[in-house]
Amino acid sequence: MKQVVYTASPNSRQIHVWSLNVEGGLSLLQTVDVPGEVQPMVINPDGKHLYVGIRPQFSIVTYAIGKNGSLEQKSIAPLPGSPTHISTDRAGRFLFSASYSFNNLSVHPIDDQGNVKAPIQIVENLQAPHSANIDRENRQLLVPCLKEDHIRIFNMDNQGYLVESHADAITTETGAGPRHMAFHPKKQAIYCINELDSTVDVLRKWEKYRIVQSVDSLPADFSSVRWSADIHMTPDGRHLYTSERSESLISHFRVSEEGYHLTLAGHYLTETQPRGFAIDHSGHFLIASGQKSDHISVSRIDKFSGELTQLARYPVGKSPMWVTILAL
């Protein structure tokens, strides 16, 4: 399986495009100059387009992905606020942009050529929405609102329009600060990393979503300010990882067979201030970006234990924040 890694560095306005080999080595394919400070990225499910959010002219840039993973800019669409997180629905028909600082969420159609267009809906008065996450059925959008300690739930119709389901909203612990989410690849379990108390909430849906476990991601003797960031799961659903920026840690959880119980298994030092990381499609490698180190690092994931072993580090642009991986 050929894989390509994209890293976004906002302070140098660059995307670095890498080829990932089966041993975990990276080879630089392309350096792309972006028309703005590039932050969140997402790949269309068709595998043919990469979308990136930029500032200070808040926009979504559409890139065509070539056969070897290289990028070519196609179009730019406006955003109603600074993009914190972007995602698509599972059919690749709509893009969602959550804006933490502008307290809104926008919905954008994606045309038949893969271009993101101007928003068809803007949901206002959300308190610090930090991500937008479509469910496995492609029917509901889960939006963690950090300053509310709520995960808001929106029903999506066939035209991409959202209607909030207030009765389905999830309430976290006071001061938790829900941020990013990961979905089990085979089960119905969903996991949310809370930025401010560094817990992971495990969600299960019966008639509505419930938190069935909340577990601390940090060592018992952790004394720094808690500042968690990202969360990802291996493709086999056996291991879950989170990142913490104050002490630059990756935390590892073992996941129960049914998916609803996490066991903290270890902590690993990584790049300084790991704002974003990703796991490759084979589940063999974890790639972390260091917002304060201007490097990314590749670590091997032990298939059985989930333990991480760092393999190599690579310089990128300034303040790398996002890592996205494509299987060609």
Curated annotation (Swiss-Prot):
GO terms for biological process: glucose metabolic process; pentose-phosphate shunt, oxidative branch. It catalyses: 6-phospho-D-glucono-1,5-lactone + H2O = 6-phospho-D-gluconate + H(+). The keyword Hydrolase applies. InterPro entries: 6-phosphogluconolactonase_YbhE (IPR022528), Cycloisomerase_2 (IPR050282), Lactonase_7-beta_prop (IPR019405), N2O_reductase_N (IPR011045), WD40/YVTN_repeat-like_dom_sf (IPR015943). The keyword tRNA-binding does not apply. GO terms for cellular component: cytosol. It comes from the Bacteria. Its EC number is 3.1.1.31. Keywords: Carbohydrate metabolism, Glucose metabolism, Hydrolase. Pathway: Carbohydrate degradation; pentose phosphate pathway; D-ribulose 5-phosphate from D-glucose 6-phosphate (oxidative stage): step 2/3. One of its GO terms (molecular function) is 6-phosphogluconolactonase activity. Catalyzes the hydrolysis of 6-phosphogluconolactone to 6-phosphogluconate. Belongs to the cycloisomerase 2 family. This is 6-phosphogluconolactonase. It comes from Xenorhabdus nematophila (strain ATCC 19061 / DSM 3370 / CCUG 14189 / LMG 1036 / NCIMB 9965 / AN6). The lineage of its organism: Bacteria, Pseudomonadati, Pseudomonadota, Gammaproteobacteria, Enterobacterales. The gene is pgl.
